[in-house]
Structure formats: C-alpha cells, structure tokens
Amino acid sequence: MKKQIIAGLLAATALLSFGCSGRNAEFGVVDMHAVESKAAVVKTVQEEVTTKGKALQDEMNTALEGKTGDERKKVLEDYTSRMNVIRSEAQNKLKASLDTALNEVAKEKGLGAVLIKEAVPQGGVDVTEDVIAKMK
C-alpha cells in the first residue's frame, strides 16, 4: 500500500513538473469589438470595400441593361463572384494585420498566448490598445 502511494505521488509530481515546465502561464486578452471599432486599418479596408462595391454595382447595372433570363443570371453570378473576391481580399488583409499585431504584442510583453477577451471569464493582460496601435 505504501509503495502505491509513493508511486502515485511520484507520478503526479512528474506530470505536474512536465506539464508546467518551460511554459509561459501569462496570457493576453484582446477585445475584438474595440479593435473593430478603433483600428484605423479596419475603417480603411471597410471604405475600400464600400468604394469597390459601389463601382462594381454601377458596372453591373450597366451590364444588366437589356439582358433577360440566362444572360441576366450569368451577369449576376459574375458580379457576385467578383464582389466575393473583393470581400475575401479585405478579410485576408485584416487577418494578416491582426495576426502580425498580436504576434508583436505577445513577443514584446512576453505572453504565451493572446485570447479573445469575450471567451475568457477572468484574468489575462489586456493588450487591446497595444494591438490597435500596431495594426497597419
């Protein structure tokens, strides 16, 4: 019985030391709502999408004049596809900017991870303003 208790304690100690060693327990949190509303790059990208979307809409309306049936459907599909590409490029640009900012802030502050603030009930270092400042 004594051997089992000692073996259990050794196993628990080994698991704890293995699981905790070399890992940074500090983590950051970022408020994504604040990032979306305050980051200049978000506003710039949204304006670009709106401008390109309006131009595409005007172009589509011109292309649709006099079209009926299958021709009209084909034009609509083409312009919908082009708008989806514009949106996808905008999302990729924002994601790249956010990822770069998060990595830089985490490295500067020595954080093991940065999590979305809404998903963390408590704790963490709030890095929202730092992330907003670094987004380009």
Give the label of every model feature segment.
Residues 15-19:
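C-terminal motif of bacterial Sec signal peptides marking the signal peptidase cleavage site
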Residues 21-136:
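Amphipathic, charged alpha-helical segments and their helix-to-coil junctions
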Residues 1-7:
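Bacterial N-terminal signal peptides that target proteins for export
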